[in-house]
């Protein structure tokens, strides 16, 4: 029997079979994937084979095999720097939700996520939520963000999940961007992922929570990853969203120091003009990246993010300005 993992609840996984039936499954024995030291060998989005558990009359089974993944997104497991946590598998794109205020998403968090997605060949769109809360100065900052990230190839959308008419694009317009694809939703806690999900999928009623008044940071409402189906209109292909717990930090995993620049699109492209093939873009003579930085062809915030990853620093220590 074959199906797709649509929910992870820790030790149990919900698997939807090709015929639509749902099975509560566990992983067989010490099941592990070759080459990956992971806290969770099975992820939402995985295509798996299962066998029903004979001892149970209900729809309970055991996962015996994970079929080859098209891709996956991975990050360091919290407090376990040598292990990884697979966020989702077999996705067509990732949607990174960010907010400029309430709470503020740091540019280094954004860039670390983008670099991680680049490493695993997952396209990313950036969704700026709560744009209705921005004052004139912040709206100018939003324009700079759009110019920066769209300029290097990441589509950007400005929405207001709670006040749809106040967004730069409507929730329905965004839904059409997501239709026909499996999209990973990710972002810091408190950016409004659950609220936007409720707007995209009427009747879903995912739990939401307020922002912490004392720290202006989000409080987790999503505990485990889960896949939701987008409503389908005439002629549309089905779309799916994988909702993930809010991430406070995004530590990259298994990225060699000399590879970091490969996952910053503009740095990688510019580095082809560097005098030395092993240039780190920090001090070398004839470095095209440093020249581009000096000429403002590469944003200071992106370079700061690059340095933080090069030095393997925590992104919370970096608050880059565009």
Residue map of PLM features:
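C-terminal effector/interaction modules appended to NTPase cores
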Residues: 1-118
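Helix-rich effector regions associated with P-loop NTPase G domains
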Residues: 11, 37-55, 67-87, 123-124, ...
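Conserved ATPase-coupling elements of RecA-like P-loop NTPase cores
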Residues: 106-107, 135-142, 251-255
